[in-house]
Curated annotation (Swiss-Prot):
Lineage: Bacteria, Pseudomonadati, Pseudomonadota, Gammaproteobacteria, Enterobacterales
Protein name: Arginine N-succinyltransferase
Pathway the protein takes part in: Amino-acid degradation; L-arginine degradation via AST pathway; L-glutamate and succinate from L-arginine: step 1/5
Active site positions: 229 (proton donor)
Functional note: Catalyzes the transfer of succinyl-CoA to arginine to produce N(2)-succinylarginine.
Record keywords: Acyltransferase, Arginine metabolism, Transferase
Catalytic activity: succinyl-CoA + L-arginine = N(2)-succinyl-L-arginine + CoA + H(+)
GO biological process: arginine catabolic process to glutamate; arginine catabolic process to succinate
InterPro entries registered for this protein in UniProt: Acyl_CoA_acyltransferase, Arg_succinylTrfase_AstA/AruG, Arginine_N-succinylTrfase
Source organism of the structure: Escherichia coli O127:H6 (strain E2348/69 / EPEC)
NCBIfam families cross-referenced by the UniProt entry: arg_catab_AOST, arg_catab_AstA, PRK10456.1
EC number of this enzyme: 2.3.1.109
Molecular function as annotated in GO: arginine N-succinyltransferase activity
Binding-site list for succinyl-CoA: 125
Length: 344
């Protein structure tokens, strides 16, 4: 059975294996053991209540409960940009016009922005390619909404998610090549690694401070503004179906879109509810996949089950109860996995 649980110190080698499969561009999952160990330690201290809000971040893993294999990772940053500035570009417009010459030009322009400072962030979503089946991607991504719904007071009103932009298998980013490299004088992979290992001071020191007309970029770079890596397209679709939208903010490195949503308008958060759980044999039928989570902050768990999402009393097997660390009579959080579909 696939289970979402909080990260543990012993997961570092498994996270290294996952990091080696990302193909680059996933800044928050570098293949660097020391950095990953620090990230795990920060998550543990967050759960223990030892960090200020500006440093808090939760990390979860997707585990096969039978074999102990870690198949994926996802995370939530509680409030971005309160320690180090959180940069992106806002894609706006500057108008240059002359009535005398009968000239009017509305030019797409990139403005450096810190507009999302203080927002909660969905980040570090990666599922091992071998496990991209049977709803695992949905479980991994949407499990975070169950945690946010259960512990709403720990998060801010706006949630953002940076989507990986267009990068090829060799680490080539058209957006970086045309813009970032001119100011940072390094390859995308180097900048990505420095950022992922916490060495972010160079961003504020070197990045352009003035608006940039996109027409000055290569056509290839212009074409990828706000576009996602092909492997990231499913993750974008998942978030958009939950209510997230692209509001013309992009990543400063690869030009990928930043999606955002008010936390209380996220479908899975808004529609999740608490039901009593009982042990037994679940009813057979053509039921949709649903997310089920316990309400245990320190031992949080999420699994997928097929059940009636409108039920008031959820019947689970002994194995499912054990995976959720629940007992008969406990209350669990339930929501349909996909509002638009009967099956995952």
């Amino acid at each position: 059975m696939m289970v979402i649980r909080p990260v543990e110190r012993s997961d570092v080698s498994a996270l290294m294996q996952l990091a080696s499969k990302t193909g680059g561009g996933l800044t928050s999952l570098p293949a660097n053991e020391a950095t990953l160990s620090v990230r795990i330690e920060r998550a543990i201290k967050t759960w223990q209540g030892e960090l200020p809000k500006s440093e808090q971040g939760y990390v979860f893993v997707l585990e096969d409960s039978e074999t102990g294999t870690v198949a994926g990772i996802c995370a939530i940053e509680v409030a971005v940009g309160l320690n180090d500035p959180w940069y992106n570009y806002r894609v706006g417009t500057l108008v240059h016009a002359s009535k005398e010459l009968n000239v009017y030009n509305a030019l797409p322009t990139l403005f450096l922005s810190n507009d999302h400072t203080g927002s909660s962030e969905l980040c570090t979503l990666f599922l091992d390619p071998e496990w991209r089946k049977e709803g695992n991607g949905y479980l991994l991504s949407k499990s975070r909404f169950m945690f946010m719904a259960a512990f709403r007071d720990k998060f801010n009103d706006k949630v953002v998610a940076e989507m990986r932009g267009v990068i090829d298998e060799h680490g080539y980013s058209p957006f970086w090549q045309s813009l970032g490299k001119r100011f940072f004088s390094m390859d995308f992979s180097r900048a990505d690694f420095l950022c992922g290992t916490g060495q972010k001071a160079f961003i504020a020191e070197l990045m352009p401070k003035h608006p940039i007309y996109t027409h000055f970029l290569s056509q290839e770079a212009q074409d990828v503004i706000g576009q996602v890596h092909p492997q990231t397209a499913p993750a974008r679709a998942v978030l958009e179906k939950e209510g997230f939208r692209y509001r013309n903010y992009i990543d400063i490195f690869d030009g990928g879109p930043t999606l955002e949503c008010d936390i209380d308008r996220v479908r899975a958060i808004r529609k999740s509810r608490l039901v009593e759980v009982a042990e037994g044999q679940p009813a057979q039928g053509d039921f949709p996949a649903c997310l089920v989570a316990n309400e245990n902050y320190h031992h949080f768990r999420v699994v997928l089950v097929r059940t009636d999402p409108a039920t008031e009393r959820l019947i689970l097997t002994a194995a499912q109860l054990d995976a959720l660390k629940c007992h008969a009579g406990d209350r669990v959080r339930l929501v349909r996995l996909c509002a638009e579909e009967k099956t995952a």
